[in-house]
Amino acid sequence: MTETQSLELAKELISRPSVTPDDRDCQKLLAERLHKIGFAAEELHFGDTKNIWLRRGTKAPVVCFAGHTDVVPTGPVEKWDSPPFEPAERDGRLYGRGAADMKTSIACFVTACERFVAKHPNHQGSIALLITSDEEGDALDGTTKVVDVLKARDELIDYCIVGEPTAVDKLGDMIKNGRRGSLSGNLTVKGKQGHIAYPHLAINPVHTFAPALLELTQEVWDEGNEYFPPTSFQISNINGGTGATNVIPGELNVKFNFRFSTESTEAGLKQRVHAILDKHGVQYDLQWSCSGQPFLTQAGKLTDVARAAIAETCGIEAELSTTGGTSDGRFIKAIAQELIELGPSNATIHQINENVRLNDIPKLSAVYEGILARLLAGNAV
């Protein structure tokens, strides 16, 4: 494929060092470009975060692309083979911070819109873009705030494509049609500090917690289902003691996380953890944080359309999957009937020398255009 506009726009976006939550006028660039084909722009800024809602049309169905202009820090610049914010083409790849996550996706959808509108100026429904500069950071003032605004005025989305990098081995081989929930716990087990030679005068929180820890790690939280693997429980950090070898610690701190399927609930998991701790007589404080509920788009119109567009452009059949971490899809699902994630390779995201394959760029744009055509132009491409 010889289309080069997607590559040029991706390079222009990558050249802007938009480390979260700094947008560096990436959204302004998108708004100026899309204004030329009839998109209205609404800036929705909260704190240091810039968000923009771009829409062409007023009717349903609404097909929305969701993405983020912010990127993670580069890490040691000297370890990059080329400056991270100077996009470089070599070895059949485009290098730069944000190349995979996710400035190429944004560029590809914008150019897909340009071609689609040129062919179908009177298309059905509406096209929208929800872009934030706070996805890689705390994600408190980004997509979640925009969703609140849209929800308050009953502005809903029929079909949403989140441009997260999803490809494993080749472009189009995987579509994310859901994500697991993420529930974290910060547990403080209370004991009584004392001299290690006089254990009868102390209470060792490591020892009192050990039986509960064994049960927590061996518990079957659920069996998963057709779309999700079983819920997992993992300890991420555990710390106790003063560093001295002759002191029984007074408390133990344990940080853990659930990645949970739709077979479990936040409330249910909390109740079961408390029950296990209480069963073993553990004295504790426990603080919870849920960063996202599980969501699922069952196989249907959007997944079918995306698979058809991938088959046409890439010649492969896409697999549906719910693996991986959380994304802003967890917020958008509250106002979106159907939602998927579809983008380039995820092999180098957040890494030194992040990159995408050059020949994947026009293909990804063609896939996005194919989705628009099938949803808003009666399958005409």
Curated annotation (Swiss-Prot):
Cofactor: binding comment: Binds 2 Zn(2+) or Co(2+) ions per subunit.
Source superkingdom: Bacteria
The keyword Cytoplasm is annotated on this UniProt entry: no
GO BP annotations listed: diaminopimelate biosynthetic process; L-arginine biosynthetic process; lysine biosynthetic process via diaminopimelate
Matches recorded under InterPro entries: Bact_exopeptidase_dim_dom (IPR036264), DapE_proteobac (IPR005941), Peptidase_M20 (IPR002933), Peptidase_M20_dimer (IPR011650), Peptidase_M20A (IPR050072)
Known EC number: 3.5.1.18
Active site: 70, 135
The entry's keywords: Amino-acid biosynthesis, Cobalt, Diaminopimelate biosynthesis, Hydrolase, Lysine biosynthesis, Metal-binding, Zinc
Cofactor section: Zn(2+); Co(2+)
Binding site for Zn(2+) 2: 101, 136, 350
Pathway it works in: Amino-acid biosynthesis; L-lysine biosynthesis via DAP pathway; LL-2,6-diaminopimelate from (S)-tetrahydrodipicolinate (succinylase route): step 3/3
PANTHER family assigned: ACETYLORNITHINE DEACETYLASE, N-ACETYL-L-CITRULLINE DEACETYLASE
Name of the protein this chain belongs to: Succinyl-diaminopimelate desuccinylase
Gene from which this protein is expressed: dapE
